[in-house]
Amino acid sequence: MSLPIVIIGSGFASYQLIKTIRRTNNDCPIHVFTNDSGDDYNKPDLSHVFSKQQSPEEVVTLSGGDFAEQYNVILHRHTWVESIDTEIQAITANGEQYAYGKLVLATGSQTFIPPFHGDGCGDILTLNSLKEFAGIQQKVLESKKVLVVGGGLIGTELAMDLANAGKMVTLVEPNTHLLANMVPDFISLPLEKACKEKGITVNLSDCVQAVNKQEQGYRVTTSNGHSYYVDCVISAAGLKPNTKLATEANLMVNRGIVVDLNLQTSANNIYALGDCAEIEGKVMAYLQPILLSANALAKTLLGTDTALSMPNMMVKVKTPNYPIQLAGNTSTDIERWSVDIDTQGLCAKAYNINNQLTGFVVTNERVKNAFPLFRELNTTN
């Protein structure tokens, strides 16, 4: 019997890879090691669990056991992988050694918590997995006032979801506008307005400095001298790839686990996929690049080396009070913008120095134009 494909991690990337492999091969042995229950769920659903009043159980689409049975995998639940031996091609988990033919690191990421001062820092919450949701759900439900650190994609979505769930929300972002790494300020200003209309306090160009415990809740102070008294603090200040195992195995690690276009790491027969992988200098924690990566890697693992091809990709900002869709380059090296604004929303097209369309953003009712624009973008690039 051939040595198995061993996958470390049971998140979206891992399970998408397994589903893709099983479309063409139901026989090759696959072992999955995960430190949680291994339940299958749609991670983007975490963006609206509070407004929909969902429980962790309701987010699950397939239990770990049912997933393992349906996709013919051996699932090692609640199991910690301690080390990787690249020489003998084996991992050690819970003190036992397991050999692999191919190893896939799908270890995901963790939410970055900035180094704040104060005795309340250990109580800061994060929401980057089903397991974390289960751990913070009750605390958030009991909270009336919530402060969210970070006004990027995840932070803005979370703040709006909490506001729609009836919470008093404060959003603190060090940049001058929301979604600063994705769009220019003229696009995010209407989003900021929509947040404020929902009762969210949006505090820009400011940073949380300290989180201190009070008799009830926490006092959060910022660099601009603001003080907020809240029941809980949630960090959405970006993601940090989980690279500890890879680093200890002497794999090449930069921001993430460095891989080539075949998603192979610096070691033979070891690959990385998803939020933990760094591809051409970028960590792309979005669904579409993970889907494309899983499709390419499945073919490679089954014997046909397949390089990842990254076309333009669409990103949806799940803010129901002001929906946004964008694709292509919308943040750097843009020569000019062509912007059309009306009562239905905004349509902004980005052009380079050669007057070629390089990206676009549509908002509100104008999101219906996203796919025609996406086709145009792919035609010109």
From Swiss-Prot:
GO MF annotations, alphabetized: oxidoreductase activity, acting on iron-sulfur proteins as donors, NAD or NADP as acceptor
What's its EC? 1.18.1.-
What does the UniProt keyword field contain? Answer: Cytoplasm, FAD, Flavoprotein, NAD, Oxidoreductase
Matching Gene3D superfamilies, A to Z? 3.30.390.120, FAD/NAD(P)-binding domain (3.50.50.60)
Q: Which cofactor does it need?
A: FAD
Q: What is the predominant subcellular site recorded for this chain?
A: cytoplasm
Quote the subcellular location field of this record: Cytoplasm
- What's its job? One of at least two accessory proteins for anaerobic nitric oxide (NO) reductase. Reduces the rubredoxin moiety of NO reductase.
HAMAP family assigned to the protein according to its UniProt record, in alphabetical order: NorW (MF_01313)
Q: Per its record, how is this protein called by name?
A: Nitric oxide reductase FlRd-NAD(+) reductase
> What organism is recorded for this protein?
Aliivibrio fischeri (strain ATCC 700601 / ES114)
